[in-house]
Amino acid sequence: MVRTDGHTLSEKRNYQVTNSMFGASRKKFVEGVDSDYHDENMYYSQSSMFPHRSEKDMLASPSTSGQLSQFGASLYGQQSALGLPMRGMSNNTPQLNRSLSQGTQLPSHVTPTTGVPTMSLHTPPSPSRGILPMNPRNMMNHSQVGQGIGIPSRTNSMSSSGLGSPNRSSPSIICMPKQQPSRQPFTVNSMSGFGMNRNQAFGMNNSLSSNIFNGTDGSENVTGLDLSDFPALADRNRREGSGNPTPLINPLAGRAPYVGMVTKPANEQSQDFSIHNEDFPALPGSSYKDPTSSNDDSKSNLSTSGKTTSSTDGPKFPGDKSSTTQNNNQQKKGIQVLPDGRVTNIPQGMVTDQFGMIGLLTFIRAAETDPGMVHLALGSDLTTLGLNLNSPENLYPKFASPWASSPCRPQDIDFHVPSEYLTNIHIRDKLAAIKLGRYGEDLLFYLYYMNGGDVLQLLAAVELFNRDWRYHKEERVWITRAPGMEPTMKTNTYERGTYYFFDCLNWRKVAKEFHLEYDKLEERPHLPSTFNYNPAQQAF
């Protein structure tokens, strides 16, 4: 083709045809109807809307239908096999007269087979005009229209209902057809229906979504939304842009689960809109594990200030086993009675013996396993036991003590013994008398400590007293003065000096400097007037 002044001959021919077709009607329309928009700069740019399709120039014909077909080809740019615009083509050459952008419609005899849908690019005064009928097979949503025909995003501002909102830069309103009144979602499948693969379609989607979320539309900067606030959309862009069906990656990965989250106070939060994890509990982070498995990571939650706080500070949700496991691992508060009978976590100031509240708790725990302890805990009426409470003798010969676990042993019970077994009567007068004066101190101490409660203990104590040994009532030891050493201080009530005391544990005499008070020493033991020297038959 021959280019003249930057334009091809085909472009000039198209310009003459369209000018002759629409020039008269434009003049008549403009003169007969008052336009709502007097500024011609408010209409769409023809060079950006109608990309040139040079390979269709050879198919041009002088007939009207051929010219319209050529015009349709110029209007919608280079066509693919499905009659759709291809990406990457030049759209800088002006293709149409301005008369098209001012409301002139195409002749009614043009059929959809020509690839030219009837459209109006600005809002005429009549509400019936300016409607963009679309074939359901070729219908695009508002975002795809703006990207497909090259209209800038600023002039292609669309509302959430799919209708263009008229503003200073975009007076046109592009309506949806009547047969589909519901809004179509902005999905990749709708883009793929125009002969593009999913990667190409998402290239357009990414450019549009990046402008929306970054708050930039090419003309001014506006505070936008963060892609992390919409995890499903952000993750889908990532997966579709790569072209591989990668598994779903949660954008909240690495963040703490929503349970127990603590947000900033209302006065510290920023004025911008933000979404937190606790606002969407159904979208936990990747650190969330199966509730059936306990994990140490669920023991701590991250606050917005970056400090770790215990999960007990936040709300608890039913079925949250991680919080239950955490509570069990924490130190239990209050009195704890262990299965082995030990009591832990006793508060300070509480009575710790068996007469306080601790003893009552242990007794109740023991009564749960031993029913016999219930009678001792609650008490029993002695009159219901069949005992003679008025008897001066022992009420029950075999009852040793309330705390005894078994009855009395046979040797502890006063049974009737036949006289044949009582030999002391026959031999007591034949036994030699015991002469404790002949025994040494070591044997006397042995008789004293090994015959407790017996007359031999009393006799040994008397003999030790005669040998200048004294029993200290507070120290509970036997003491005597060291031989050849006089007290360093002596008064009527006490004396101080070196003394020997008998260590029964090590069985030896130990010298020690001691302050001795006389009133703390035991007096001479009192012996009965008559007693039998046989310790096996005569008890003290």
Curated annotation (Swiss-Prot):
Q: Where is the composition biased (Low complexity)?
A: 300-312
The molecular function terms in GO held by this entry are: poly(A)-specific ribonuclease activity; transcription corepressor binding
Q: Which InterPro entries does the record associate with it?
A: CCR4-NOT_su2/3/5_C_sf, Not2/3/5, NOT2/3/5_C
Annotated segments matching region Disordered: 96-126, 276-342
Tree of life domain: Eukaryota
Record GO biological process: negative regulation of intracellular estrogen receptor signaling pathway; negative regulation of transcription by RNA polymerase II; positive regulation of cytoplasmic mRNA processing body assembly; regulation of stem cell population maintenance; regulation of translation; regulatory ncRNA-mediated gene silencing; trophectodermal cell differentiation
Residue ranges under compositional bias (Polar residues)? 96-123, 321-333
| Entry-linked Gene3D superfamilies | CCR4-NOT complex subunit 2/3/5, C-terminal domain
Q: Which residues carry this modification: Phosphothreonine?
A: T93
Any coiled-coil regions, as ranges:
none
What Pfam families is this protein classified in? NOT2_3_5_C
Q: Which residues carry this modification: Phosphoserine?
A: S126, S157, S165, S169, S242, S274
Q: Where in the cell is it found?
A: Cytoplasm; Nucleus
Keyword set includes Repressor: yes
Q: Name one GO cellular component term.
A: nucleoplasm
Q: Which UniProt keywords apply?
A: Cytoplasm, Developmental protein, Nucleus, Phosphoprotein, Repressor, RNA-mediated gene silencing, Transcription, Transcription regulation, Translation regulation
Family from the record: Belongs to the CNOT2/3/5 family.
Q: How does it assemble?
A: Component of the CCR4-NOT complex; distinct complexes seem to exist that differ in the participation of probably mutually exclusive catalytic subunits. In the complex interacts directly with CNOT3. Interacts with NCOR1, NCOR2. HDAC3 and GPS2.
Q: What does this protein do?
A: Component of the CCR4-NOT complex which is one of the major cellular mRNA deadenylases and is linked to various cellular processes including bulk mRNA degradation, miRNA-mediated repression, translational repression during translational initiation and general transcription regulation. Additional complex functions may be a consequence of its influence on mRNA expression. Required for the CCR4-NOT complex structural integrity.
- Write the protein's name: CCR4-NOT transcription complex subunit 2
